Amino acid sequence: MCENHVQQLVAIDFLVVPTVSFRLLFVFVVLGHHRRHAIHFNVTAHPTAEWTGRDIAEAFPWDSAPCYLLHDRDSIYGAAFRQRVGEMGIREVLTAPRSPWQNPYAERFIGSLRRECLDHIVVFNEASLRHILKAYVEYYEHSRTHLALEKDAPKSRAIQPRETGIVVELPQVGGLHHRYERRAA
């Protein structure tokens, strides 16, 4: 039953990442609206509607599919994709043509990913991009604060008490970002 829409709404989108050899890789992102949770990502050089359909099924195994799927009108979401989504019992919510602001959480995630990570790293190939994305999503999920989540991360963190002890720096995303924790002396 789909009663609370925000907990059952998922946004998807693609972003293009050039490699050092100017080859284009496409990143498929699935983002939950409730706590801006990055549910799934995958990388391919040749996205098709069939591939995207298989990937959405991979993102939601068994009976974990959301009620609503928000996406743009890109041709990549063709008949094979729509059929797979329908078989999973998901209702599609389409944005208006040329209206990226109607998919704000996915667009914001992609913008943050670019500004905070991809603009500072050279991508060599698909394997290196997967490695980079895995590290960034780990950082995004567990360490990066979000004002809309009251400065918490999508995966909620315990607040450390102010006690005597040294503050240690924990590098993340290959040293691009850092997390700080108190450790007992």
Q: For each predicted feature, which ranges?
A:
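Charged DNA-binding/catalytic regions of mobile-element recombinases
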Residues: M1-A185
